[in-house]
Design a protein with these regions (language model features):
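Short secondary-structure boundary/capping segments
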Residues: 80, 187, 246-250
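Cofactor-binding active-site loop characterized by glycine-rich and histidine/acidic residues
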Residues: 17-20, 32-163
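Non-catalytic, mobile gating and regulatory segments of ester bond hydrolases
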Residues: 1-5
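N-terminal capping segment at the start of a domain
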Residues: 9-26, 174-176
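Glycine-rich beta-alpha junction loops
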Residues: 37, 68-69, 176-177, 211, ...
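Thiamine diphosphate
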Residues: 109, 113-224
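Generic beta-sheet signal
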Residues: 60-62, 138-141, 169, 228-234
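Glycine/aspartate-rich loop-and-adjacent alpha/beta segment that forms the canonical ThDP
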Residues: 212-280
Length: 280
């Protein structure tokens, strides 16, 4: 896909997120909107995968640690062809395959059921370690939130991955600076995050999380690193594309009402598929 097509796709995904949350009447708005560009880059350029054969042995594995942002993953998967886009309207419904946190047993293409925050990187690191033992060539990716870095078990996984030089593992950090209790630096400061990962012997790449080309370039750089695992710190704006949601912790864990959804969709449609990044 061309850069313009990728930006248009990310905008379509953002619009679907708003519609899904409105229909569900519950869920998280800020994180999914902020990560639409990363998931577009993953599902349409970075991942080696086959939507028609989601259990293909050679596929790259994508773990979503902060499962509450799953609307963006579901929307990206639907647009990639894993299931009909119309099914997105079943988000959080009783019996739906699209639960409020992804469940592997329900939806093909999900590698693991998302559990407590902070546990996803441990799952991904274990999978990457097993892949190396089995001499498999696929890569393992893990999406984590910044607030998950307040969990001790996350750093145990960081240490484990470095000890075993898991160069087949790439983590993406959604560095959006908010969490349910407020701003991360007020709740429990995370900076200097880059230096912390470097101290654990990870390769660190920092990118504008709304520049799809930069995200793709960073993932390609990670593939070329063979000495240690890589983390890509994505500086994102929570609620990106919807002006009244951007950078506000109160939108971490609530959906829009009808009026807010209409305003949000108007904002997104005005963008015509173009989310401005710091590089422009």
């Amino acid at each position: 896909m061309t850069p313009k097509e990728l930006n248009n796709k990310a905008n379509e995904i953002r619009q679907d997120i708003i519609k899904m949350l409105l229909t569900a009447g519950s869920g998280h708005s800020a994180g999914p909107l902020g990560m639409a560009d990363v998931f577009t880059a993953l599902y349409f350029e970075i991942l080696n995968h086959d939507p028609k054969n989601p259990e293909w042995e050679g596929r790259d594995r994508l773990f979503l640690s902060n499962g509450h942002i799953c609307p963006v993953r579901y929307a990206a998967m639907a647009h990639a062809g894993y299931f009909p886009i119309d099914e997105l309207t079943t988000l959080r419904k009783l019996g739906s395959r699209l639960q409020g946190h992804p469940e592997r047993e329900r939806l093909p293409g999900i590698e693991t059921t998302s559990g407590p925050l902070g546990s996803g990187l441990a799952q991904a690191a274990g999978y990457a370690y097993a892949a190396r033992m089995d001499q498999k060539n696929f890569r393992v990716y893990c999406i984590t939130s910044d607030a998950e870095h307040q969990e001790g078990n996350h750093w145990e996984a960081v240490n484990f991955a470095a000890k075993y030089n898991l160069s087949n593992l790439t983590a993406f950090v959604d560095r959006n600076n908010i969490q349910i209790d407020g701003y991360t630096e007020d709740v429990m400061p995370l900076e200097p995050l880059k230096a912390k990962y470097e101290a654990f012997n990870w390769s660190v790449i920092e990118v504008d999380g709304h520049n799809i080309e930069a995200i793709i370039d960073a993932a390609n750089m990670a593939k070329a690193i063979h000495e240690n695992p890589t983390v890509i710190i994505c500086r994102t704006i929570p609620g990106k594309g919807v002006e009244f949601m951007e950078n506000l912790p109160e939108w971490h864990g609530k959906p829009p009402n009808v009026g807010e959804a209409i305003e949000a969709l108007a904002d997104l449609r005005t963008l015509s598929g173009k989310i401005k990044s710091e590089h422009e």
